[in-house]
Amino acid sequence: MDTKIFLDSGDPQETREALKILGNLDGQTTNPSLIAKNPQAQGKKFTTKEVYSFYRKVVEEISGLIPQGSVSVEVYADKNTRVETMINQAKEMNTWIPNSHIKLPITQNGLEAASALVKQGIRVNMTLCFTQQQAAAVYAATKGAKKGEVFVSPFIGRLDDKAINGLDLVKNCVEMFKAGDGHVEVLAASTRNLYHHLACLEMGADIITSPLTILKQWQEKQPVPAEPTNLQPIGYENLDLNKPWTEFNIQHELTVAGIDKFCSDWDQLILP
């Protein structure tokens, strides 16, 4: 199987369970919302410094369990976060563990930060991708990076929630990058059920990140939910990957909503 399997979780105990179930794990994705759900964070409030210390402790534990894998660690970025602030956070987080991919949002500032970071050898995972144009912008902004250094994370479930076929986005990104140099890998994210997981395997996504519940269902060969029939398809766009990244339309309401949600979950952990 060419597709790598990641666990989507901010809990090292789930990493242990996934390793026990699957025998191997290629990586893990974390984000502020998942860290806020970590059992050790429940009902607690931290200073900003303590939150980062807690996040570091969690990813260090995960990294120790899957030292050969990738662990995605997300910067705190709201719509006003400056490029320099993202870069500085990313550099700091990159020192936490030797196998990190730093998650940045697909916004103008996020892409500028990513472009600078890959030139310094820092690996990135560009998150909250909801359009093929956003994925193309990631490719163009990170030119010169090597395979394995850049992930783009199309979010399936959140498009499905809007009655749009999120799997089409994954398929279109995989197809588009066939014409590229291979430096960006498609990391299918926001899988909601076993159908999503299996469909991404079939369409050849480079990586799939799924929660523990779905990985268990997959391993146990549980019944697969029916393909939804009420979703609006997403047509393929013929995009020129050689264009400057600034020429692609990177705006999407779900990217903005996703950033707001991550920030809100993070802020709830912090003492007023």
Region spans (language model):
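Alpha-helix-loop-beta-strand connector modules within alpha/beta enzyme cores
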Residues: 50-70, 94-96, 115-124, 167-182, ...
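C-terminal extensions of enzymes
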Residues: 235-272
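Generic secondary-structure signature for well-ordered alpha-helical cores
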Residues: 60-64, 95, 143-144, 171, ...
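Active-site beta->alpha loop and helix N-cap motifs at the rims of alpha/beta catalytic domains
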Residues: 1-6, 11-15, 21-25, 30-119
